């Protein structure tokens, strides 16, 4: 071996391999919570970077003598960058970067700078120091391998494949069917590593994209039979109770349920929302869970309006905007509803300008319609108070009945508020992100109260059903130490993390008697619930969700990674808990019927989305959406007409 290395000048290459290998392992241990349970998993975590280090750096050996070391350094840097990008991404999302997420950067990347920067640390220089060491070695030693290195490459390539196959075989013995049944990226990284996961993800992405081309009308039959068999008959007490009313959705950015009725220094953080939760004209759902994947806010929007699950990788908004959809706004067109979305950000963020056309949304009031001055904006766009204030004339200009959606932004990570925007005290839990969360949540609460008052003033309150929901978690698992203090616990366990995925859901309609609803439900359940309240039966539509107010409502809530929660079981990170007690259960104690249901639910939804199957299915009375009918370009007359309407009033 020594002779082989010396003769072929492979010392530089092997140094690069060892540096990348060890650095990657250190990165795993310091940054990722992968749930290592046994010695086999510990060994695999250490070994799995080796095969990919050999494989990718080995391509540098194919270059000619003068370029060889340069190629190895460039590949080493790119792999280091991929590792570091995953580390930064994981610090907030507790997830790993996928190919679709990289594609999302085209629409979102330019506006994510502040959030990404806040996640970086001075010690992160560690992940690039070894690249600098390699550059110095190349300059000082400058002794690349021999000119003809194809034989060396073949040996290195074969070695990397052998290491990978051994790695995979051991992983499969510990986690059978790892590559075929795992929705959870944590498992894939734990057993195979970030670099091998990226290859796996690329293959899955190609496979997903090919499903549309191969699909035909016969594929929709299985899905139709399954979803119609699981249709929930509406509750006669509530069906049609809000018929003819305007619909106003409000996305409550990053709001989690623990904040409701929570106090800081004796002061309620969200006094208006607290009051609303206990109002007799509000349906407040205290066991409602977000089910978002990597698309976060856009996933929540998609589920609310289409009652289908998000993608396993990436955002439906970004990757499937060409699909045929049967969204709530499109369904309500048969009832003469006009639809509009209000958002104090650019049209292209999350590819909304294209997705809304597929959903049949008539108007999109984006940042072009608002006064986006420095005082009114922060981070992702317009602050909530000026956003709602400036939205009112636009809302009043719409013909009624209308279906509208307002997307708030101020309560967004890292939750800092400008001076003068709030006098509410920050928390004192030793974590700036958690501490600031209470201030921005209070600001959001004040903006919602202002919005309700404006609706009453303009006569729209009594004519509308108002649906408000937390779009996704705000505080990630990286802040569990502070969150334990917030909740008065010694520590936050995996079970606790699952419970913290609760987000508030309010359905408020003046004149309609509400109640506190304890049923377990998720994002996909909202569309059928609202449509039934409006008097629209969903039996002919293909929806994953279940009317929460129905007596037949299903209370098993799938998460995108295959975990789930129900009144009986909580499955998180592959472990089962008793939902009522939090006690961990042995798999032998668990009725796996809920597991099977979750797998089937995700499978059916994925078939619809990846195969674009709704193009083959048209319910009676539904007019298929033609995206080319919609144009969200702001014209001068839009502003002048709104101004004229306000003057007339």
UniProtKB/Swiss-Prot annotation:
Residue spans, topological domain Extracellular: 31-42, 91-118, 173-649
Binding locations of substrate: 412
InterPro entries, alphabetized: Alkaline_phosphatase_core_sf, LtaS-like, OpgB/LTA_synthase_biosynth, Sulfatase_N
Subcellular location as annotated: Cell membrane
Biased composition (Basic and acidic residues): 631-649
UniProt GO molecular function: metal ion binding; transferase activity
EC number(s) reported in the record: 2.7.8.-
Entry membrane topology: Multi-pass membrane protein
Residue ranges crossing the lipid bilayer per the database entry: 10-30, 43-63, 70-90, 119-139, 152-172
Keyword set, alphabetical order: Cell membrane, Cell wall biogenesis/degradation, Manganese, Membrane, Metal-binding, Secreted, Transferase, Transmembrane, Transmembrane helix
UniProt-annotated site: Cleavage, residues: 215-216
Presence of keyword Transmembrane helix: yes
Residue positions binding Mn(2+): 253, 297, 471-472
Main subcellular location: membrane
Function description: Catalyzes the polymerization of lipoteichoic acid (LTA) polyglycerol phosphate, a reaction that presumably uses phosphatidylglycerol (PG) as substrate.
Further comment: Restores staphylococcal growth after ltaS depletion.
Protein name according to UniProt: Lipoteichoic acid synthase 2
Gene that encodes the chain: ltaS2
């Amino acid at each position: 071996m020594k002779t082989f290395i010396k003769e072929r000048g492979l010392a530089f290459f092997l140094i690069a391999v060892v540096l990348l290998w060890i650095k990657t392992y250190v990165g795993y241990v310091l940054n990722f919570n992968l749930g290592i349970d046994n010695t086999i998993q510990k060994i695999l975590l250490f070994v799995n970077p080796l095969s990919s280090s050999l494989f990718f750096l080995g391509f540098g050996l194919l270059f000619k003598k003068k370029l060889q070391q340069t190629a190895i350094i460039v590949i080493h840097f790119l792999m280091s960058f991929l590792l570091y990008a995953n580390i930064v991404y994981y610090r907030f999302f507790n997830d790993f970067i996928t190919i679709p997420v990289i594609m999302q950067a085209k629409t979102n990347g330019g506006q994510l700078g502040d959030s990404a920067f806040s996640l970086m640390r001075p010690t992160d220089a560690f992940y690039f120091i070894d690249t600098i060491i390699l550059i110095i070695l190349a300059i000082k030693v400058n002794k690349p391998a021999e000119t003809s290195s194809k034989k060396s490459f073949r040996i290195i390539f074969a070695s990397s494949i052998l290491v990978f196959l051994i790695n995979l075989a051991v992983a499969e013995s510990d986690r059978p069917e790892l590559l075929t049944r795992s929705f959870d990226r944590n498992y894939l990284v734990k057993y195979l590593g970030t670099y091998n996961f990226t290859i796996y993800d690329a293959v899955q992405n190609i496979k997903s994209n090919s499903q549309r081309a191969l699909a035909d009308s016969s594929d929709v039959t299985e899905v139709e039979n399954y979803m119609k068999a699981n249709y929930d008959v509406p509750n006669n007490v509530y069906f049609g109770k809000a018929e003819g009313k305007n619909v106003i959705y409000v996305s409550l950015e990053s709001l989690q349920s623990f904040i409701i009725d929570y106090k800081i220094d004796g002061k309620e953080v969200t006094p208006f929302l607290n009051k609303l939760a206990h109002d007799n004209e509000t349906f407040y759902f205290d066991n409602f869970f977000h089910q978002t994947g990597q698309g976060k806010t856009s996933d929540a929007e998609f589920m609310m309006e289409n009652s289908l699950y998000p993608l396993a990788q990436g955002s439906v908004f970004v990757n499937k905007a060409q699909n045929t959809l049967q969204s709530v706004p499109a369904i309500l067109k048969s009832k003469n509803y006009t639809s509009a979305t209000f958002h104090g950000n650019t049209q292209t963020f999350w590819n909304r300008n294209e997705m809304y056309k597929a959903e049949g949304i008539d108007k999109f009031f984006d940042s072009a319609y608002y006064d986006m001055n420095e005082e009114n904006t922060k981070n992702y766009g317009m602050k909530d108070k000026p956003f709602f204030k400036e939205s009112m004339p636009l809302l009043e200009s719409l013909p009624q009945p209308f279906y509208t959606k307002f997307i708030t932004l101020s309560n967004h990570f890292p939750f800092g508020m400008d001076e003068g925007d709030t006098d509410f005290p920050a928390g004192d839990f030793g974590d700036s992100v958690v501490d600031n969360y209470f201030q921005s949540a209070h600001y959001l609460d004040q903006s919602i109260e202002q919005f309700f008052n404006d609706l009453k003033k303009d006569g729209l309150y009594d004519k509308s059903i108002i649906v408000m929901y937390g779009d996704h978690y705000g505080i990630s698992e990286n802040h569990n130490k502070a969150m334990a203090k917030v909740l008065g616990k010694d520590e936050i366990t995996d079970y606790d993390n699952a419970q913290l995925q609760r987000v508030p859901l309010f359905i408020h309609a003046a004149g309609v008697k509400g109640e506190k609803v304890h049923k377990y439900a998720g994002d996909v359940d909202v569309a059928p619930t609202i449509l039934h309240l409006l008097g629209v039966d969903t039996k002919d539509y293909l929806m994953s969700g279940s009317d929460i107010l129905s007596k037949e409502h299903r209370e098993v809530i799938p998460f995108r990674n295959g975990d789930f929660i129900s009144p009986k079981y909580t499955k998180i990170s592959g472990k089962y808990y008793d939902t009522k007690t939090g006690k961990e259960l042995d798999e032998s104690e668990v009725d796996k019927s809920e597991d099977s249901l979750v797998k089937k639910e995700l499978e059916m939804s994925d078939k619809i989305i990846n195969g674009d199957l709704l193009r083959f299915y048209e319910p009676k009375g539904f007019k298929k959406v033609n995206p080319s009918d919609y144009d969200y370009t702001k014209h001068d007359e839009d502003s002048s007409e709104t101004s004229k309407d306000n003057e007339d009033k």
